[in-house]
Amino acid sequence: MSSAPARREKSPKPKAGGKAVFDWQDPLRFDDLLSEDERLVRDAARAYAQDKLMPRVLKAFREEHFDRAILNEMGALGFLGSTIDGYGCAGASYVAYGLVAREIERVDSGFRSAMSVQSSLVMFPIFAFGTEAQRKKYLPKLATGALAGCFGLTEPDVGSDVMGMKARARKVDGGYVLKGSKMWISNAPFADVMVVWAKLDEGGGDTIIG
């Protein structure tokens, strides 16, 4: 992940035997628990969110439009799929990923959701459950933002209840045929890669696949 200088001054730490100093921006002294690399990642995310994302929030809401270039920018900073090792990903800690998400969420939840869907709901399932060929085909381009991904789980009748979902997948030569309806799919309007949850009926029992 890229780094940037810190954007706020820390309150001074108390000297031995002195009075405790309260930092209203970090009342639990969370910053003291972070590694130097994690602080650099957080500061890079804070600078990006404040300088590049904040000016786009009003336009995004008024025009109901997501600027696709944001994923490319996040990819250049190493924010997409950051906890994955290899395949063009940063291999960062989950703490670092959480810090990035918090800084982007602070500016706009929609922008944070776009990053989280790409990273956690598209890239990680491909990394954890996909074939090596699928990992090599999709992950590097998803990591840079060249490809955008979406995640289809929620259905009109059962919401996000995995056990109750009605979408079905039927195995055919070369893949599966999907039948069913999904809704509220973040990133769907501009997605190139879609991870869709469905039930595969094999041997008389339902098997959930994505």
Predicted features by range, described:
Residues 167-170:
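A structural signal for short hydrophobic beta-strand segments in well-ordered beta-sheet cores
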